[in-house]
């Protein structure tokens, strides 16, 4: 997990490495509490073999987009996915640039809704409507490039979440009562949120 985080931090070293070195180490300033950065610093633990497979196949070889990725002897072909897909990208994302995400969205064989949000990799996604921050862009058409897509967009202030919720509601059945895990065939392990969320990597 830490190796993956270090890799992503190096993509924006001035903001995510050197600013902390200068402010915290050289100037002795205490870092201000920031919920998104606290959450971001709790990396996902990943076995080395999976980490290497992920980097090699998805970044080095771009195997999924080429239709060459094989999992358990099955070749994955996104063009065979015919169900509706909602794809969100962030305008200033340094890890998954909007141009790349858009190209990936074009690989699906069914209807795709692409939405672009303001801000970057984390704040562009984790943007609750109550915050009234940033904006998002929508366009029902999917032209060849994200630049062409942008020329036909509608800009809406605030979070992209309500747009996504409307999309989900149109494709979902009616609401049902939440299930009670204690009444299922398996005994619950423990109360929510679970001890695993308290484990630091």
Report residues per predicted region.
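Catalytic active-site module of serine/aspartate enzymes centered on a nucleophile-bearing elbow/loop
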Residues: 113-201
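Short alpha-helix in the alpha/beta-hydrolase fold that links the catalytic acid
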Residues: 97-107, 118
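Hydrophobic, well-ordered secondary-structure elements that form the walls
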Residues: 55, 104, 164
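The feature captures the conserved acid-bearing segment of alpha/beta-hydrolase catalytic domains
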Residues: 71-82
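Alpha/beta-hydrolase-fold enzymes
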Residues: 1-52, 57, 63, 169-201
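Acidic catalytic loop of the alpha/beta-hydrolase fold
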Residues: 92-96, 121-123
């Amino acid at each position: 997990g830490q190796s993956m985080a270090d890799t992503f931090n190096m993509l924006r070293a001035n903001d995510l490495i050197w600013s902390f070195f200068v402010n915290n180490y050289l100037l002795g300033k205490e870092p201000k509490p920031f919920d998104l950065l606290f959450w971001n610093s709790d990396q996902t633990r990943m076995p080395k073999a999976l980490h290497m497979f992920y980097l090699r196949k998805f970044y080095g070889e771009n195997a999924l987009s080429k239709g060459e990725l094989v999992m358990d002897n099955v070749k994955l072909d996104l063009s065979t996915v015919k169900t509706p897909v909602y794809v969100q990208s962030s305008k200033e994302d340094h890890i998954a640039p909007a141009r790349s995400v858009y190209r990936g969205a074009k690989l699906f064989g069914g209807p795709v809704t692409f939405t672009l949000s303001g801000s970057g990799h984390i704040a562009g996604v984790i943007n609750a409507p109550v915050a009234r921050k940033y904006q998002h862009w929508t366009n029902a058409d999917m032209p060849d490039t994200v630049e062409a897509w942008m020329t036909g967009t509608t800009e809406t202030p605030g979070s992209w979440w309500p747009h996504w919720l409307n999309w989900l509601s149109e494709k979902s059945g009616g609401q049902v009562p939440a299930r009670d895990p204690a009444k299922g065939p398996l005994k619950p392990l423990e109360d929510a949120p679970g001890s695993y969320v308290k484990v630091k990597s």
